[in-house]
């Protein structure tokens, strides 16, 4: 009998059809690219969040309160080696994140079904954290901040006054920048066109200092 080779190579060319919808790799995919139940970081805010999260090759993102998973998915689309752990308490939304990830080309995205901050225990150390939901959970932002690598980026969004208060306190303790977004889209008003305002969103973003890491290396004699 003829022995079969151990390795078989199969190449498949995927050619887009004439009505295929091209999706770029720049942050800010259309909202309808994601299956969602309304719990979605909208396109303009998502593009802003990703610019501040600043994905680089090989880096890991925690997407906390993932909703539809849009931020974590776009993080992974930035570079083939980028990784995401999406944390979502709702089982239907967690399953939806997995479907969106598979459909948008990042099936290796990891979904953790659980409630933060408890679900964060034991996760690998992140280079960046996005908190899109659950920001009022006691101790959540502090745990995310402490988990970050030096130089890591943390971005959190608030749509309620209660969560705004948490972000204001976080800025007072950890520094960073607070921005309020008001986005309006043109919409029909009878036979005319007017501006339809979306709900205002407050964004807190901060970068964890490198100073502490440098000081620790001096104390332990690990400088080069």
Language model features: what each stretch is:
Residues 141-202:
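C-terminal substrate-binding/active-site "lid" region of AdoMet-derived donor-dependent transferases
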Residues 58-67:
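Conserved class I S-adenosyl-L-methionine
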Residues 81-85:
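Short beta-strand element of Class I
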Residues 68-80:
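Conserved SAM-binding loop of SAM-dependent methyltransferases across substrates and taxa
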Residues 40-57:
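Conserved alpha-helix/loop element of class I SAM-dependent methyltransferases that forms part
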Residues 87-128:
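S-adenosyl-L-methionine
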Residues 8-14, 188-224:
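Core SAM-dependent methyltransferase catalytic element
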Residues 1-38:
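A contiguous loop/helix-start segment that scaffolds small-molecule binding in enzyme catalytic cores
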């Amino acid at each position: 009998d003829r022995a079969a080779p151990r390795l078989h190579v199969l190449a498949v060319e995927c050619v887009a059809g004439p009505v295929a919808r091209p999706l770029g790799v720049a942050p800010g995919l259309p909202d309808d690219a994601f299956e969602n139940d309304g719990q979605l970081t909208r396109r303009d805010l998502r593009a802003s969040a990703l610019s501040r999260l600043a994905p680089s090759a090989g880096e890991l993102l925690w997407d906390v309160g993932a909703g539809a998973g849009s931020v974590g998915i776009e993080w992974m689309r930035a570079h083939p080696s980028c990784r995401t752990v999406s944390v979502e308490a709702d089982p239907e939304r967690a399953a939806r994140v997995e479907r969106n990830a598979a459909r948008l080309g990042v099936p290796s995205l990891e979904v953790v079904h659980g409630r933060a901050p408890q679900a964060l225990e034991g996760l690998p150390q992140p280079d960046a954290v996005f908190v899109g939901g659950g920001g009022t959970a006691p101790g959540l932002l502090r745990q995310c901040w402490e988990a970050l690598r030096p130089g890591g980026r943390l971005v959190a969004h608030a749509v309620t006054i209660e969560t705004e208060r948490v972000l204001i306190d976080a800025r007072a303790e950890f520094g960073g920048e607070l921005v309020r977004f008001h986005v309006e889209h043109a919409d029909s008003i009878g036979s005319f066109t007017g501006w339809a305002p979306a709900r205002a969103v407050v964004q807190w973003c901060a970068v964890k200092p490198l100073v502490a890491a440098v000081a620790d290396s001096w104390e332990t004699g690990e400088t080069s």
